[in-house]
A protein has these predicted regions:
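C-terminal substrate-binding/active-site "lid" region of AdoMet-derived donor-dependent transferases
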Residues: 162-219
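Conserved SAM-binding motif I beta-strand of class I
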Residues: 103-108
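Residues in the short beta-alpha loop(s) of Rossmann-like NAD(P)-binding domains
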Residues: 110, 120, 188-190
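Active-site segment flanking the S-adenosylmethionine/decSAM binding pocket
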Residues: 136-176, 180
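Glycine-rich SAM-binding Motif I of class I
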Residues: 90-94
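S-adenosyl-L-methionine
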Residues: 1-78, 114-148
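Conserved class I S-adenosyl-L-methionine
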Residues: 79-88
Length: 227
């Protein structure tokens, strides 16, 4: 990790941005996909009218995504469904597919991003792929019905607090109705205070990458220690 004073030196920030761009482009070239490029909300062609509650699209960094996935405190991936809320062009879905999850799902309200993600899933080429049940779902996140399996939920600050609050409320209710292990990885946690309102999901000590928090269900038989 590069200290902030170093990042602010002349030319360093530009060099870091260039290096990041190269890494994204290499990932796309190597795996025959297209995950790069931001997309503003007005361009998204959303399935809902509440576009003001969404954030613009910017993909997770492949290196950070792989680190997060490698440090998940779960013993048997095959029991869990991985869900990226606000999954964009599907980069985290492709990274998650490198692990033997029961299924990998992306929830995306933009028709444009969903279409790209669907193409990426179909074209993805990676000898490390372990999960082949991968799908992008084009739906308002508030209307998404969480699977009954244990879950790993990934949030890269995808929504404004009003929308995120409702999604978390739905998730908490799902855990209450069907107690099971649920992990939530929240990157760039600007609205972390919303988790304080949840009854069945609480923060753990885990911080797999800088600027991340991990939450876990406190269903019977599960500890919030993160182990």
């Amino acid at each position: 990790m590069i200290p902030d004073p170093i990042k602010r030196l002349p030319g360093v920030h530009s060099a870091l941005m260039t290096a990041t761009w190269v890494q994204f482009r290499y990932f796309d070239w190597r795996h025959r996909v297209k995950t790069t490029g931001d997309l503003l909300v007005p361009e998204m062609d959303a399935v809902t009218q509440d576009t003001a509650l969404a954030g613009f699209y910017h993909p997770s960094h492949p290196r950070s995504g792989r680190r997060i996935l490698s440090l998940l405190p779960i013993a048997d991936h095959s029991r869990y469904t991985f869900i990226d809320m606000g999954s964009g062009k599907g980069l985290m879905l492709l990274l998650a597919a490198e692990h033997p999850f029961k299924a990998v799902r992306g929830v995306e309200f933009s028709r444009k991003l969903h279409a790209v993600a669907t193409d990426n899933i179909a074209n993805y080429t990676n000898p490390r792929q372990r999960c082949f049940d991968v799908e992008s779902v084009n739906v308002d996140a508030r209307d998404y019905e969480f699977p009954s399996t244990p879950l790993v939920i990934y949030l890269f600050n995808p929504f404004r607090h009003e929308l995120l609050g409702q999604v978390l409320k739905n998730l908490d209710a799902s855990v209450a109705a069907n107690p099971r292990d649920v992990l939530v990885v929240y990157l760039n946690p600007l609205d972390a205070y919303l988790f304080e309102r949840l009854e069945h999901i609480k923060e753990t000590p885990l911080h797999p990458v800088e600027g991340s928090r991990v939450y876990r269900s406190i269903a019977p038989g599960n500890r919030v220690s993160g182990r």
